[in-house]
Structures are given as C-alpha cells and as structure tokens.
C-alpha cells in the first residue's frame, strides 16, 4: 500500500506541493497525494485531522503531512494528528525572523493573493500573450515578446511557453519550423526581425515519432524517417542562424524554462 502524503495549506497549496514533490522525488517510492487547500479556520483544521487519522488507520501506518499553515492554532491542531508533520513555516520562517531581526506578517495565503497587484497583472498579460501567439497563429505584436521559441511540431514549445508565462510572467511566443522552411533553407520571414529573441527546442527523433503517433498514428508526419529529417534540418538551421537551443527529450518543463531564462538573461520573479 502506498504511503499517504497530505499537502495542507491555508491557500492554494501550490508552494507546499512543489516543495513536497522536490523532497519526495529523492525516494524510490510512489506516494498517494491528498491535497487539502484553504484550511483557513479551526473547523477546517479539525476536519483535516480527521482525514489524516482515517488515512493512518486505513494504511496501517502514520501519514506524512507537508503544511504551510500560518495560523499557529490551526497548525497545532494538525500537528496532533497521527502523522509525521513537516511544518515548512516553522522550519524556515522562524530562523529567518531571528536572522533578519524582523517579524514576518503571518498572513494567510500571502504568496498567492492580491489579484490587483502589478505582479498578478503582469502574469495574466503574459498568459494572454502566450495563448495568442501559440504555434505561430499570430505575428501581431511579436516585438513585445520576451522570448520566441522555435522548433518542429511537438517538441515542447507550447507547454514551455505557458509555463514561462504562468510561473514567471514571461511573454513567450512560439513558432513552428515546418518542411517548407527547410526547403527554403531559412527562418520564416516573420521571425527575421527578432533573431535576438529566438530560442530553439529540439527532441530525440524516436521520441518525437512516439509523441506524433499518439496524435496521428501511421502518418508520414509521425514516421521515424520524417522525424529524423525534420530534427536534422531544424538543428542545422538553428546552428546556421546562431540560435541557442536545447533538447527537451530528457528534461522537465521546469528545467527547460530555467535554462531558457538563464540563456536569454531574463530576470523574472517566480510566482
């Protein structure tokens, strides 16, 4: 039976879940994750304890709890559950308070609130921009892009663009490289004025064929030889044009996005 892991937060739980994934990935073990967001009252804290204790009885072992509860009373309630409780705020905030000689705000959901802030508006604008400029569907206002991802179809451009927008507020457009571009031997004319904003994504041809076969099985588009041709041509074009690029084959979206930010020297706040 898989160990049960609870992600308990008084907000969305995104911070706690990200941290939990980073820690749990160090163990060669699968886990059953239970998300419990918006625990913003004592009643909800007691209800959460009931869930945790029920899981412990069912599993025959203590649950594991990652918590970012700010309210000390709610936190104390959860800590009385039959679980190993890993309190991120107590572990990190209290030492920082001592080091900085400052008292933290102890405000619930502080990391994911205030829809009227400039940071939030910047992120929404970036998401809208990336959606409008997905897969080369619009050349309008390309000059506003922070980065333009290029690569063959299904090389990871769309998810990377959206991740950059949602996580960092980056206006990321993406543009497909197609056989017609390879025949001409040069980039699409729409991209010519923005060469300094281009970043390329490549992928292992065999992996590309597998991905494309899920979409259009048995087609020329998904054939291994066609995928090899497109990848070879795309990489050759990126080398000729001096475009920095990486292979997305064995990299997570997070790793790809971080590399892009470093390579194009974009200084962005993580949300």
Curated annotation (Swiss-Prot):
It comes from the Bacteria. ADP binds at residues 151-158. It is an enzyme of class 2 (transferase). Its EC number is 2.7.11.33, 2.7.4.28. The keyword Cell inner membrane does not apply. Keywords: Kinase, Nucleotide-binding, Serine/threonine-protein kinase, Transferase. The keyword Transferase applies. Pfam families: Kinase-PPPase. One of its GO terms (molecular function) is ATP binding. Transmembrane segments: none annotated. Disulfide bonds: none annotated. It catalyses: [pyruvate, water dikinase] + ADP = [pyruvate, water dikinase]-phosphate + AMP + H(+); [pyruvate, water dikinase]-phosphate + phosphate + H(+) = [pyruvate, water dikinase] + diphosphate. Belongs to the pyruvate, phosphate/water dikinase regulatory protein family. PSRP subfamily. Bifunctional serine/threonine kinase and phosphorylase involved in the regulation of the phosphoenolpyruvate synthase (PEPS) by catalyzing its phosphorylation/dephosphorylation. This is Putative phosphoenolpyruvate synthase regulatory protein.
